UniProtKB/Swiss-Prot annotation:
GO cellular component: cytosol; nucleoid
UniProt binding sites for Fe cation: 37, 73, 124, 156, 159
Subunit structure: Homododecamer. The 12 identical subunits form a hollow sphere into which the mineral iron core of up to 300 Fe(3+) can be deposited.
Pfam families for this protein: Ferritin (PF00210)
UniProt record similarity statement: Belongs to the Dps family.
Name by which UniProt lists this protein: DNA protection during starvation protein
Length: 188
């Protein structure tokens, strides 16, 4: 009977454990946060399609920016999860079930763009809380994950500001991206 090969020593993980970081807990948090980015991308696709009429049509590009940037966040952090020895669930239904944020369902009154904006805002606020927790968990212990998480956090804060501006007429400093999904902080 042949012995199973020994797992390789991963210095990049070993140094994080020596700094006091619980890798298993971190990977679990990252998988849930990354699942939220993926499900948000999916739901934002549906929400964007329902931004119709004179008022809704102007909101589509902003929703599209947030949607594409969330997909980029998913791709960016997935790489880190695997570097840390983790992985994503093999079943997409399981991925959706473990999401750190609730589903961004299309509201019943979807013909009112403000109702869709409220759903978008709630999703961004959950993402902000989630990525802040990752930043707190990794600050001073895991510079790579911290860097990725804080870049994602900056974009989620921008998304929140956009939706607050649109819902409440609050100044946000929103600027038009050079192209939809051109994430200034987390692009690869």
């Amino acid at each position: 009977m042949q012995e199973k090969p020994q797992e390789p020593k991963v210095v990049g993980v070993e140094i994080l454990e020596k700094s006091g970081l619980d890798i298993k807990k971190l990977v679990d948090k990252l998988v849930k946060a990354t699942a939220a980015e993926f499900t948000t991308y999916y739901y934002y696709t549906i929400l964007r399609m329902h931004l119709t009429g004179m008022e809704g049509e102007g909101l589509k590009e902003i929703a599209e920016d947030a949607r594409l940037e969330d997909r980029l966040h998913f791709e960016l952090m997935t790489q880190r999860i695997y570097e840390l020895g983790g992985g994503l669930p093999r079943d997409i239904r399981q991925l959706a079930d473990i999401s750190a944020c609730s589903d961004a369902y299309l509201p019943e009154n979807w013909k009112d763009p403000k109702e869709i904006l409220k759903v978008l805002l709630e999703a961004e606020q959950c993402a902000i809380r989630t990525w802040k927790e990752v930043c707190d968990m990794t600050y001073g212990k895991d510079p790579r994950t911290y860097d990725l998480a804080q870049r994602i956090l900056q974009e989620e804060i921008e998304h929140e500001a956009w939706f607050l501006e649109l819902l409440y007429g609050r100044p946000s400093g929103h600027f038009r991206r050079s192209s939809p999904g051109n994430a200034p902080y987390s692009k690869k």
